[in-house]
Swiss-Prot record:
InterPro entries per record: DNA/RNA_pol_sf (IPR043502), DNA_pol_Y-fam_lit_finger_sf (IPR036775), DNA_pol_Y-fam_little_finger (IPR017961), DNA_polymerase-Y (IPR050116), DNApol_IV (IPR022880), PolY_HhH_motif (IPR024728), Rev_trsase/Diguanyl_cyclase (IPR043128), UmuC (IPR001126)
Protein's recorded name: DNA polymerase IV 3
Family of this protein: Belongs to the DNA polymerase type-Y family.
Organism this protein belongs to: Mesorhizobium japonicum (strain LMG 29417 / CECT 9101 / MAFF 303099)
GO biological process: DNA-templated DNA replication; error-prone translesion synthesis; SOS response
Active site as annotated: 111
Gene: dinB3
Amino acid sequence: MVPERGADPRKIIHVDMDAFYASVEQRDNPELRGKPLAVGGAAARGVVAAASYEARAFGVRSAMPSVTAKRKCPELIFVPPRFDVYRAVSAQIRDVFAEHTDLIEPLSLDEAYLDVTQNRLNISSATTIAEMIRAKILEVTGLTASAGISYNKFLAKMASDQNKPNGQFVITPRHGPAFVETLPVNKFHGVGPATAAKMEALGIETGADLKERSLSFLQQHFGKSGLWYYQIARAIDERAVDPDRPRKSIGAEDTFAADIVDLETSLAELKPLVAKVWGYCEGKGIRGRTVTLKIKFADFQQITRSRTVAVPIELSDFEHLAADLLGSVFPVRKGIRLLGVTLSSLGDVLPPDQRQLRFEL
């Protein structure tokens, strides 16, 4: 397939640090190396923010309740997060990127897209640039990174997962469509468990199956996302690497295998969603003022509840507001199928003496 619109193929790299938070902790504390490690709180209501590869071997994952993680891996070691350290290391990594290009789109502290079609060192091979970047990151930080190289962002992201940890993978324009066709849809970036399950119920299990469906079929079943699925099934992604991409909100949601009808279970499911959103906020050094709760019931009716405060909130306020919003809809007459929480009205972190929760009247 010829790259988008007949243009010369772009050269996009997706760099993803390997188990970033956990790797920083193992780097700084030799006693933790080679051991199953979770960054997060070990308390009964704690949540795993990140897991080392040793912990992942036991099934421990980020956003997992700490009690569940400990059950899966009794020898799991918990350490509290040090976001100031992670941000400092991320700045070092960003400096390495800047040696090659200004077109850097950070996704979080530990991953970013780079467009190296034109680059500072005039190196024609994106594969070579990725190797140089990974080697320099290791030299500067003592940490390993993986990379995906391709001609668009979707494929570069998918490629970076292929040779983790400490590896890289290339998807060329010639091989892009075939790569997508063989990939299970539940491995597609941006296709969550609920969407993958819906696709599989429609007989769509691979990229090839997805490609067989018409645009109208996909839009009928997936709404506005149908066009996106139609394009990525054909290895098409025309999104530019955007260094100035504004983030208007940060959210997380989950669809449940069985409908939830009680408040206690709903609050337990809300906790890791709040933790996931907060982890991103900590990583970016930002806060928000508006908390929005989203609920989709078993009959697909959807409701939202929101609350805005005068100044950017801290984690305890976020947890409290989200729980209050959830409690306000109970008791419910029908089961909850999906739960989501979003933080918006984003801004930089305020000085500590200004972080008092003041509700708007």
